[in-house]
A protein has these predicted regions:
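Conserved SAM-binding loop of SAM-dependent methyltransferases across substrates and taxa
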Residues: 70-81
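A short acidic, Gly/Pro-enriched loop at the edge of an enzyme's catalytic core
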Residues: 117-125
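Short alpha-helix
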Residues: 196-220
């Protein structure tokens, strides 16, 4: 696993950016400003470290990061107080990792993971995006890594699922760049010399390899759209919930990132995912896996979070606005909202937009489909009258809080134009269909959830309506939802039709 098959060609640029950067932290706005293609997104995107939230890290935890790349995960683990040994087989990436982590307790080694020997052992051994390069000896490789885990510790593996939903929907296999080749068993004719031994695994296959390494206690997580830049991480328990179809759909949304997964995906992926979950195959057909494996359940509980149902993360915002929602259910389902990285509590643009509860908050989860899900179902059915009913329900909720007055020039902001005459409360900036839950035919019973932002002085009703329709149109396109308009209709044109 010490060759250089995973280079993306951007290593020199990544190293140069890191060398000049004043802020090399895992959530650095400075580094994120350099994102302009897939390699820079991979190395500098803040979503990379979302994958590690199910792990119990902190002061005194010793970590081995195998195939550390440019040091993204090593950096984040060390920021949590862990002591990290980062091993990277490529010299250029090892140099980048050393720069990324130079001010923290991280020892970067250039070499092969199979050469690592450590008498003290590690509490966690991270094998993220590496096992697929173990060639024809995955059992031997995993056994070596398992031997580096100290008593009470765990091995953490992240890898694509060979039978993941994305691959069935014709997304390109991540390493060979061709559709279906993993499902076909990696035929040699499809590979190059550099990819001839690349292999990913189904859930039963991977579970078997971990068991063969003596790691019989396993806790499985499902990152979406995959483990590289996850916006959601689910647990097996999430799929066992009575409302799993709606719950998983709410948490995941479109299960495939069409902007970077390649291939020719043309199906309604969100509808298919709902069917897969409803049939009981959701966990086995996740696009990728995060597995925490140990010799006993006590070690699993010590090193990973077994209480959560799921984690959902905000998009790649500025550091001050990055949030995680941790969903739990101990008899009452709750959502705990927290910053993913330490920030000042004063967040917003300093003038008109404020992030509510910046220090975090816990709310009860409101069960049931949200109005976006209802609207998508009615659009799939070609029921435009039903879509109008959904939008009318939204309108009724908006009108409850409306105030009729004339907005002055002094109080105007991007979502409150001077001269506006119908003003909604400031938190109604977030009044999208995805944030309304309850019976569509009884608008008075609809509950407004996840009202994260607040605009000073209120927001213009018309602009919020346009934003609501645009978000629904974006959801239609992102998930490939079948609709009665021409397939080439853009998000903006769909939003126009919905607003009308």
């Amino acid at each position: 696993v010490s060759d250089r098959r995973w280079r993306d060609g951007a290593e020199d640029r990544i190293t140069a950016v890191l060398r000049d950067a004043a802020d090399r932290s895992s959530a650095s706005d400075e580094l994120a400003a350099h994102i302009d293609d897939w390699p820079t997104r991979y190395h500098f995107g803040r979503a990379r470290t979302n994958l590690l939230h199910p792990l119990r890290l902190g002061t005194g935890v010793r970590i081995l990061d195998v195939g550390a790349g440019s040091g993204v995960n090593s950096r984040w683990a060390a920021e949590q107080g862990a002591s990290v040994v980062a091993v990277e087989g490529d010299a250029l990436r090892a140099e980048a990792a050393a720069l990324r982590c130079e001010d923290l307790d991280v020892e970067v080694r250039h070499g092969s993971a199979t050469d690592v020997v450590d008498d003290n052992g590690f509490d966690l051994v991270l094998c993220i995006g590496v096992l697929e390069y173990a060639g024809n000896e995955p059992d031997r490789f995993l056994a070596h890594l398992a031997g580096l885990v100290r008593p009470g510790g765990a091995l953490v593996v992240a890898i694509e699922n060979r039978f993941g939903l994305a691959y069935w929907l014709q997304a390109d296999e991540d390493h060979l760049g061709l559709p279906f080749v993993g499902l076909e068993g990696y035929p040699p004719v499809a590979a190059t010399g550099a990819t001839a031994t690349v292999r990913t695994f189904s859930r039963p296959e991977l579970a078997g390899h971990l068991t063969a390494a003596g790691l019989t206690a396993q806790r499985w997580y499902q990152p979406f759209p995959d483990y590289k830049l996850p916006t959601t991480v689910l647990t097996d328990r999430c799929y066992d919930q009575p409302d799993a179809v709606d719950l998983v759909d709410q948490l995941v949304g479109p299960p495939i990132d069409r902007s970077r997964m390649g291939g020719r995906v043309s199906a309604d992926e969100r509808a298919i995912h709902r069917q897969v979950v409803g049939a009981g195959h959701g966990a086995d057909m996740a696009n990728s896996f995060l597995v925490v494996a140990a010799t006993d359940d006590t070690a699993l509980d010590r090193r990973s979070d077994g209480d959560a149902l799921a984690w959902r993360f905000t998009g790649d915002r500025r550091r001050a606005h990055l949030r995680v929602r941790r969903l739990t259910d101990d008899g009452v389902r709750r959502i705990d909202r927290r910053a993913t990285h330490p920030v000042d509590t004063a967040t917003g643009d300093g003038r008109w937009l404020v992030l509510r509860s910046p220090g975090g908050a816990t709310d009860d989860y409101t069960p049931g489909p949200n109005l976006e899900q209802v609207a998508l179902d009615r659009i799939r059915a070609g029921d435009l009258t039903g879509v109008r009913v959904v939008l009318a329900a939204w309108s009724a909720v908006a009108d409850r809080g409306a105030v009729h007055r004339t907005v002055s020039d002094a109080e105007a902001h991007p979502f409150l134009s001077a001269g506006s005459r119908t003003v909604l409360p400031g938190d109604h900036l977030d009044l999208g269909l995805d944030n309304l839950v309850g019976p569509v035919d009884r608008p008075d019973e609809l509950r407004f959830v996840d009202d994260e932002w607040e605009a000073t002085g209120g927001v213009d009703r018309h602009l919020v309506a346009v934003r609501t329709c645009w978000k629904l149109a974006a959801a239609l396109v992102a998930g490939g939802t079948r609709h009665p308009w021409p397939p080439s209709t853009t998000v903006d044109r769909l939003a126009d039709k919905l607003c009308a």
